[in-house]
Amino acid sequence: MKVNISIFGFGTVGRALAEIIAEKSRIFGVELNVISITDRSGTIWGDFDLLEAKEVKESTGKLSNIGDYEVYNFSPQELVEEVKPNILVDVSSWDEAHEMYKVALGEGISVVTSNKPPIANYYDELMNLAKENNAGIFFESTVMAGTPIIGVLRENLLGENIKRIDAVVNASTTFILTKMSEGKTLDDAIEEAKSLGILEEDPSKDIDGIDAYYKAKILHWVSYGEPPEEEERLGIREVRDARNVRLVAQVSKGKISVKPRKLSSDNPLLVEGVQNAAVIRTNNLGEVILKGPGGGGRVTASGVFTDIIKATLKFPNLR
């Protein structure tokens, strides 16, 4: 059976996802068929070569430079209404993408996303809309990239009371703090992170804790089914001694906090490089510890791809 997919956003993650789909287009008896791709230059829609699209984007910077295919200038809402995919995949950084999700879910189209603000800010509305229209919304890669903390909370710990989550969920600040502990200044560490493509498009989202805040808010929604009442956010700009310091997101019922914390040398959150880690404290299991890579195109795309498979298996009507 064939599942038609629209990819919205064709940056590093989108292109890595295209590569994975090309490698594994037939899986669990399902054929994954990408029928449209959208970047800032427009939308290609129809029977095109996925890897050719990837190569054109990488070599020219614009999907619209692809050869023999018509390029459409759809609005995000028009994209959903005209293309009518079975699954809409958002791997963009568009903060207002929830409006597109609402159109898709209202049409019974499942949504897979790695985009944090729409889930953090509109979780309840989107989940209810999905339920009303027998669709799904999947967002594993919004937190810890491909390391499956969302799946663990939504599926594997359903019988547990989540007492607290402590997590290092921003790989960029971990990299920067690691470099600062080796003697680099904040500015020099930021420049090195930029040169390696580790930082977000707007570095302030990482440095000021905004990215980690969105992730903490998503973890609160998933763990407790409601928004936090208390919020605290402090970035890493004021850190002077970075030795054993990490930007830690702490989530408990009604409260989220994101701020730098000095950790003991045996703390599982004291990860290096671009690693992420989380300690989930539960009533029966005690501490559940997750560690894994927290960024990178292929790593994030892996989580997105897993969500695409989950969507096809959970909603047979897609096929």
From Swiss-Prot:
Alphabetized GO MF terms: homoserine dehydrogenase activity; metal ion binding; NAD+ binding; NADP binding
Binding site for NADPH: 10, 12-13, 40, 57, 92-93, 114, 116, 296
Pfam families: Homoserine_dh, NAD_binding_3
Residues that coordinate or bind NADP(+): 13, 40, 92, 114, 116, 197, 200, 296
Keywords: Amino-acid biosynthesis, Metal-binding, Methionine biosynthesis, NAD, NADP, Nucleotide-binding, Oxidoreductase, Sodium, Threonine biosynthesis
Residues engaged in binding L-homoserine: 200, 211
InterPro entries from the UniProt entry: Asp/hSer_DH_NAD-bd, HDH_cat, HDH_short, NAD(P)-bd_dom_sf
Annotated catalytic residues: 215 (proton donor)
GO BP term (any one): threonine biosynthetic process
Cofactors, names only: a metal cation
Keyword Oxidoreductase applies: yes
Annotated residues for binding of NAD(+): 13, 92, 296
Enzyme Commission number(s) from the entry: 1.1.1.3
Cofactor note: A sodium ion is seen in the structure; a metal ion may subtly affect the relative position of the nucleotide-binding region to influence enzyme activity, and could increase the stability of the enzyme.
Gene3D superfamilies per the UniProt record, alphabetical: Dihydrodipicolinate Reductase, domain 2 (3.30.360.10), NAD(P)-binding Rossmann-like Domain (3.40.50.720)
Catalysed reaction, written as an equation: L-homoserine + NAD(+) = L-aspartate 4-semialdehyde + NADH + H(+)
Subunit structure: Homodimer.
Family per similarity comment: Belongs to the homoserine dehydrogenase family.
Function: Catalyzes the conversion of L-aspartate-beta-semialdehyde (L-Asa) to L-homoserine (L-Hse), the third step in the biosynthesis of threonine and methionine from aspartate. Utilizes NADH but not NADPH as coenzyme.
The protein, known as: Homoserine dehydrogenase
